[in-house]
């Protein structure tokens, strides 16, 4: 476990007593995959993003004494749960950030509600965080499986990909992504021919890809992420699947995945994202600073950690407290204009509503540099991208 203190400095004998009396101690825990298939899309980059948010918020000058912890949940719910309990019970953590891997995130959401903390989830995709397992202490940033499906799934089906076969990671996120994309495909007039589920994480996709190939579907939908998606695409190319006429749909695809594959292999793939480093001046400026520290451009998960941390600290400052439900209620009190996500708001169920974007990976000829990888094809309004709120999760009712 790593610990970083970004707190109040000694300001002299006269200033220090007043500062000590007024300062609010805030402990943030960045909980994610630091060594496995999701390490590139979250990992240390999310710690850096949280640190940048604390610095850019100027927390010290505003009387917030912020400490950042980080740990590797290894994509295992039991490991993530144990860390979360230890953080809340022994380390005084006020909010847990990032938490990719939906099975881990759902477990941590329950513990957070029990302990009165805040979960600012930027990494997980399951819609259950704001539906079946919603809590007044959960805020779901960045994306979810419904938004991914409404972007990539709809675009590919309407472009002629009428029949689908899913290759799905066998855990909560994969199941949710397959389910939401199936709905969108069928609503658009397409048909799902079948699915096969692979262990999470996996390295050998040969038998699963052969089943998908044998289905004869127009589109093989990859309902997985990170290293699993990269490996599946590489192996599909080796088997000649796309060369034979079937298309791949990478339903959750990150800039780090495209970079790992290279434009030659990934060109033409469509993807849905909440953020791209080159989308506007503000994104470019922040991403350049991030790259100086991390050595790569940020993913939308990294951007989400930064944005969520900024909004959380603003809420703590506004109410002068780190009490979980009170902070989240303050975050829901008014819309925000975020430098990375634009205009948005935290809905009563904890779902953050902001625009999503459909991108297509550029060809090597179209790309002007190492990270010049996306061309924007469409904007999906936040109100259309995410599922409507269900009554059971409307925490504005008290």
Q: What would you call each of these model-derived segments?
A:
Residues 15-17:
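N-terminal signal peptide c-region/cleavage motif recognized by signal peptidases
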Residues 4-8, 20-398:
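Extracytosolic ligand-binding ectodomains
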